[in-house]
Regions:
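NAD(P)+-binding Rossmann beta1-loop-alpha1 motif at the extreme N-terminus of oxidoreductases
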Residues: 2-78, 136
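Rossmann-fold NAD(P) dinucleotide-binding segment
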Residues: 66-126
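Helical "substrate-binding/catalytic lid" subdomain
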Residues: 177-300
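Rossmann-fold dinucleotide-binding core
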Residues: 108-190
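Hydrophobic beta-strand scaffold residues
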Residues: 42, 62, 126-128, 169, ...
Length: 301
């Protein structure tokens, strides 16, 4: 299920929903700001004082304690430092949370999300887990998205409100799926960024600035993302001999490694990919397509 989030005027989303936001770091503050500006009655709480001042000026109510905040909201949004922080704050408040809906957008692992969902179920709390695919400045703007899993009823009930933050994607009742998808997407992002850093380091000794390299890398890498669906079709089909693919032998990255070394820079990022390629070549699959490195990752040695 996917919806297109927007913030068109006040009272957007679910009318008459009282919301409490626990955690006013950069992300929590951004989430709360969107809710307040949309006209929702919003109570906010943060461990350290002062962070609520700007939100209070916009119309939010600052709670003196986390318990006060929880008791003030039908919907409780938690955006804290980590999984341990969530339990530290919420465990003493399980009774107050009973009968309410908890949306946890704290960064957690899939297993931690499932554990928290089980804790919530035992306490009579409706649980929805969220993975935010945006930086704080993007919340409520085009390009922002939030991945959800957990209670389908909670997602349907509060979907209009959740859409205020960005496009809402729901992945099912397994509370860990949103986190898993979130981390998988971040894995792709960080490997891509590492590739950019590798390239920028390689050309730097030749007097090329990172900014100049970026102006060429961005359109090139954007164009290359068109291959994702082609690779996906090969992976899902399980046949790496399909014609039209670049072979693993042709994809050998020895020249890139040599060039990087000649420039006097590290080549760890490329060496990682080369290792995935060589494993398949050494196993006798050199004439098969590049997508086969998926098997090096899917079934590690």
């Amino acid at each position: 299920m996917t919806t297109d989030g927007s913030t068109n005027g006040s009272n957007s989303g679910n009318d008459s929903v009282s919301v409490s936001v626990l955690g006013l770091g950069a992300m929590g503050g951004a989430l709360a700001t969107v809710l307040v500006k949309a006209g929702h009655g919003t109570t906010v709480w943060n461990r350290s004082p002062g962070k609520a001042d700007g939100l209070v000026a916009l119309g939010a109510r600052a709670a003196a304690t986390a318990g006060d905040a929880v008791r003030s909201g039908d919907l409780v949004v938690v955006c804290l430092f980590d999984h341990a922080s969530v339990h530290e704050v919420l465990d003493p408040l399980a009774g107050d949370l009973a009968g309410r809906t908890l949306v946890n957008v704290t960064t957690t692992s899939p297993e931690q999300s499932r554990e928290l969902a089980a804790w919530a179920e035992r306490a009579g709390i409706t649980y929805l887990d969220g993975g935010i695919m945006a930086v704080p400045q993007m919340i409520g703007a085009p390009g922002s998205s939030v991945l959800y899993s957990g209670s389908a009823d909670a997602f349907r009930r509060y979907e209009p409100l959740l859409d205020l933050w960005g496009t809402s994607d729901y992945f099912g009742e397994d509370a860990g799926l949103a986190s898993l998808y979130d981390l998988a997407l971040l894995a792709g992002m960080y490997v891509m960024f590492a590739g950019f850093m590798q390239g920028a380091a390689m050309v730097a000794p030749a007097g090329v600035t990172a900014r100049d390299f970026a102006s060429r890398a961005a359109p090139w890498l954007t164009a290359m993302t068109g291959a994702f669906q082609e690779y996906a079709a090969v992976i899902d089909g399980g046949d790496y001999t399909v014609e039209g693919q670049q072979s693993l032998e042709f994809s050998d990255l020895g020249d890139i490694l040599a060039a990087g070394s000649a420039q006097g820079v590290g080549t760890d990022a490329v060496a990682m990919v080369q290792g995935l390629i060589r494993r398949q070549i050494d196993a006798g699959h050199g004439t098969e397509g590049f997508a086969r490195i998926y098997e090096s990752i899917r079934r590690p040695a």
